[in-house]
């Protein structure tokens, strides 16, 4: 089993199935692997001559497929996700791409079905199954890898969250932008005490418009 590969990133590209591939040259051998789009964006923004990629090898229809991740924790989360019935590699990568490591773990541990369902291809039943099967495992695992979750008092109520997310998504903001706005506003104790969804939406739009 290959734990990681360290070498020179040659290029990233999309294949005919719109999946992002990284070509990593190690000792004059080019390894092709699928990586999350988040990882690809990071590489384009911060180019480097030498790169360490944590890998997972999967054999499908007798064909080996290599997946690459920026961190060992991200790879382990991927492995946990594909262990869930009905969750394949592409859906696992989509979850990581949509929410990112910490937010995805937080959503699973807190049983936040709505957040999990933001991922294309993940419906309510699938989200519920992910939370049900992984909640206990990830509650223990995230402590080992140093992922800290905010206390429930450090986030607005679920009803407010849903209203803010639905409104901002309808206005064209991305999940990433919405989550950043909510996270920033949640640092204000006065806002946390506020249960008025309209005020949360107004403040979020103001922050996003800066």
From Swiss-Prot:
Domain notes: Has three domains with a flexible linker between the domains II and III and assumes an 'L' shape. Domain III is highly mobile and contacts RuvB.
Residue ranges, annotated region (Domain II): 71-149
The protein's name: Holliday junction branch migration complex subunit RuvA
A Gene Ontology BP annotation from the UniProt entry: DNA repair
Subunit structure: Homotetramer. Forms an RuvA(8)-RuvB(12)-Holliday junction (HJ) complex. HJ DNA is sandwiched between 2 RuvA tetramers; dsDNA enters through RuvA and exits via RuvB. An RuvB hexamer assembles on each DNA strand where it exits the tetramer. Each RuvB hexamer is contacted by two RuvA subunits (via domain III) on 2 adjacent RuvB subunits; this complex drives branch migration. In the full resolvosome a probable DNA-RuvA(4)-RuvB(12)-RuvC(2) complex forms which resolves the HJ.
Keywords tagged on the record: Cytoplasm, DNA damage, DNA recombination, DNA repair, DNA-binding
CDD domains in the cross-refs: UBA_RuvA_C
Protein family membership: Belongs to the RuvA family.
UniProt subcellular location: Cytoplasm
Region described as Domain III: spans on this chain: 160-210
Organism: Rippkaea orientalis (strain PCC 8801 / RF-1) (Cyanothece sp. (strain PCC 8801))
